[in-house]
Every structure is written in structure tokens, then in C-alpha cells.
Swiss-Prot record:
Disulfide bonding pattern of the chain: none
Keywords: ATP-binding, Cytoplasm, DNA damage, DNA recombination, DNA repair, DNA-binding, Nucleotide-binding, SOS response
HAMAP family found in the cross-reference section: RecA
Organism from which the protein derives: Cutibacterium acnes (Propionibacterium acnes)
Molecular-function GO term, any one: ATP hydrolysis activity
Protein name as it appears in the record: Protein RecA
Primary role: Can catalyze the hydrolysis of ATP in the presence of single-stranded DNA, the ATP-dependent uptake of single-stranded DNA by duplex DNA, and the ATP-dependent hybridization of homologous single-stranded DNAs. It interacts with LexA causing its activation and leading to its autocatalytic cleavage.
Keyword Coiled coil: no
Gene Ontology biological-process entries: DNA recombination; DNA repair; SOS response
GO cellular component: cytosol
CDD domains: RecA (cd00983)
UniProt-listed SUPFAM superfamilies: P-loop containing nucleoside triphosphate hydrolases (SSF52540), RecA protein, C-terminal domain (SSF54752)
Binding site for ATP: 67-74
Protein family membership: Belongs to the RecA family.
Length: 348
């Protein structure tokens, strides 16, 4: 018993010293604190928010978005920027590909006047800028587009045909080691957009891999695999793509869930389309033949007409979204006045 008391006393002294040197909360017993609900940035698609399990992209974490060309990777990232800005956050876009279209970003709801944009000359410069911005503690979200375009300085200054094996992988590994703790401390989300490559000589399993080595796979809390599954048509005119996103890795909720949504050309993710799909799945919107109804009132015939109705009636769209998220446990239901929130019984 005396030995146990001595150990407890020594531990208490050590904990006090740690908190004195590194600040309160730098070490704690796991049972002392209640589980904190993970804050998230909405993606623009309620279906994807639900698949992520926390209502969007987790704050203070690294997210990798990868997939084939023109699958919707940058569109998802720009919608996240627009939603973060709508909540008053400051966002940055590291445009390593030098391909950002400000006009398209504006159509998606991005405030381009306040968006911080950098078009770096090489990979080292891009990641140093990103690291400095993160350590300022002022950012809500930073996007790096793309990992494949983070070319090391030595490769840019070298000759064509020179071998630079593993340079980019080492660069990414070092940068992510430095940034991970700073992102968590600042509550900043970092989105790395990545491209696909083919592994040569693979006989079994998928030959696809992402660029930049293995570090990003390890450090990412969420990895999203974005694929275009079909082309949307209005008559004979192509108006957009049906996109499927698989949550390939998720450290904050169960992984491997999938979400499908529409990306319309010039408009981005169709929020209304996701609300219709999820509303029908949850039983909040009723579908009878080609007619859709909500609260016993017809919304319209055909998905396109309902989409137009919800776009013109944002209050109805917001109400449906609230009900979907509440139904799926991602948003707490409003408790009427005079009702006990724990039991649901009326208080007298």
C-alpha cells in the first residue's frame, strides 16, 4: 500500500511538472474528459457528409482526395472551402498545378476576394507556405492541388532524364511530420488532392496507386476515392456527371461507406439532388411513380423539377436537410420548451 501511495505521489508530481512546462491539458487521464464530438466542415453533399460519419470533413485533420482525371476532386475541395467561408473561416488554396479557375470557384460559392491563393515554383516552396499558414492558427481550411504537382526543387533545376528516385516521397514525409501536430493544435483541416498512377507488373489486386509515397496514406485521417460513374443528360444535352465517392480510410468514423451525388457542369455538387436521394432513402420525401411529395404536399414530377423547386425554396431544402441529419443522428433534434431533453417527457 505504501509503495502504491509513493507511486501515485511521484506520478502527481510528474503530471504537475509536465503541465507547468507544456501547458494545462498537455497530459490527462482518458476517463477524466467526456468524449468530444468531432467538428466538421460540410462537403456540399449531404450524402457524402453522412458517409463520412461526422457530418463532413473533420477539423484539425489531414484529408486526401484522389481519383482519375476530371472525376470531381477539386470540385469537392472547392465546396468545402465555400462552406468553411460561409461559417466565417479563412481558407487558402495552394495551386501547385497552376490550374485554378476563379470563375468556376465563384459559381460554387467560394468568396474568391478573401481566398488566399499561392502558385508556388516548386514542392518545397509550396509545403513551406502551407506550413507557415497552418502555424499562424488563423486558417480554417487549406487545400493543396495537387500532390503530383509538388515537384522537388532538385528535379526542376536538373536535366531532363536525370533520376530523382524518392525525392518527392521524402519531401512529403518530412512536411507531414511537421504539419500534423500544428494542424491539430490550430483546428485547421488540410486537403491534399492526389492523382492516380499505375503500378507496373501487378498481376493480382488493383494496379492503381497514388503519388507522393506512403506518408500521406498514413497521416490522412480520411481518404476519399472519387469516381465518375455516369453522364447526366437533359434530353440529348450532357449536363453533368453522377459521382461516387468511397471513404477508403476513416479514423473518425466507420470506413468504407459510399456516397453518390450529381455534379452539374458550371454549378458543382447538386445539393438539392443529394437531398432528394437521401430524403427518399430516409422516408422524409415520399416517391410515388415519378412524383415526389413532402409533408403530404407534392414537390413535383421528376427529379429535375423537384431539384428546381428546392433551389427556388431554400427554406424547404434546409428543413429537409435538418430532418435527414437528425434522422441519421448527425444533428441533435430541437427539444421543445418544457420537455426534458434526456427523457422526452413534459416537465410540469
Amino acid at each position: 500500500m505504501a509503495a502504491t501511495a509513493d507511486r501515485e505521489k511521484a506520478l502527481a508530481t510528474a503530471l504537475q511538472q509536465i503541465e507547468k512546462q507544456h501547458g494545462k491539458g498537455s497530459i490527462m487521464r482518458l476517463g477524466e474528459q467526456e468524449t468530444v464530438k468531432i467538428a466538421a466542415i460540410p462537403t456540399g453533399s449531404v450524402a457524402l457528409d453522412v458517409a463520412l460519419g461526422v457530418g463532413g470533413l473533420p477539423r484539425g485533420r489531414i484529408v486526401e482526395i484522389y481519383g482519375p482525371e476530371s472525376s470531381g476532386k477539386t470540385t469537392v475541395a472547392l465546396h468545402a472551402i465555400a462552406n468553411a467561408q460561409a461559417e466565417g473561416g479563412i481558407c487558402a488554396f495552394i495551386d501547385a498545378e497552376h490550374a485554378l479557375d476563379p470563375e468556376y470557384a465563384r459559381k460554387l460559392g467560394v468568396d474568391t476576394d478573401s481566398l488566399l491563393v499561392s502558385q508556388p515554383d516548386n514542392g518545397e516552396q509550396a509545403l513551406e507556405i502551407a506550413d507557415t499558414l497552418v502555424r499562424s492558427g488563423a486558417l480554417e481550411l487549406i487545400v493543396v492541388d495537387s500532390v503530383a504537382a509538388l515537384t522537388p526543387k532538385a528535379e526542376i533545376e536538373g536535366e531532363m532524364g536525370d533520376s530523382h528516385v524518392g525525392l518527392q516521397a521524402r519531401l512529403m514525409s518530412q512536411a507531414l511530420r511537421k504539419m500534423t501536430g500544428a494542424l491539430n493544435a490550430a483546428g485547421t483541416t488540410a486537403i491534399f488532392i492526389n492523382q492516380l498512377r499505375e503500378k507496373i507488373g501487378v498481376m493480382f489486386g488493383s494496379p492503381e496507386t497514388t503519388t507522393g509515397g506512403r506518408a500521406l496514406k498514413f497521416y490522412s485521417s480520411v481518404r476519399l476515392d472519387v469516381r465518375r460513374v455516369e453522364t447526366l443528360k437533359d434530353g440529348s444535352e450532357m449536363v453533368g456527371n453522377r459521382t461516387r465517392v468511397k471513404v477508403a480510410k476513416n479514423k473518425v468514423a466507420p470506413p468504407f461507406k459510399q456516397a453518390e451525388f450529381d455534379i452539374l457542369y458550371g454549378q458543382g455538387i447538386s445539393r438539392e439532388g443529394s437531398l432528394i436521394d437521401m430524403g427518399v432513402d430516409c422516408g422524409i420525401i415520399t416517391k410515388s411513380g415519378s412524383w415526389f411529395s413532402y409533408n403530404n404536399e407534392q414537390l413535383g414530377q421528376g427529379k429535375e423539377n423537384v431539384r428546381k423547386f428546392l433551389r427556388g425554396n431554400p427554406d424547404v431544402a434546409n428543413e429537409i436537410e435538418d430532418k435527414i441529419l437528425t434522422h441519421l443522428g448527425l444533428r441533435e433534434a430541437e427539444v421543445p420548451e418544457g420537455v426534458d431533453p434526456r427523457t422526452g417527457e413534459v416537465e410540469f
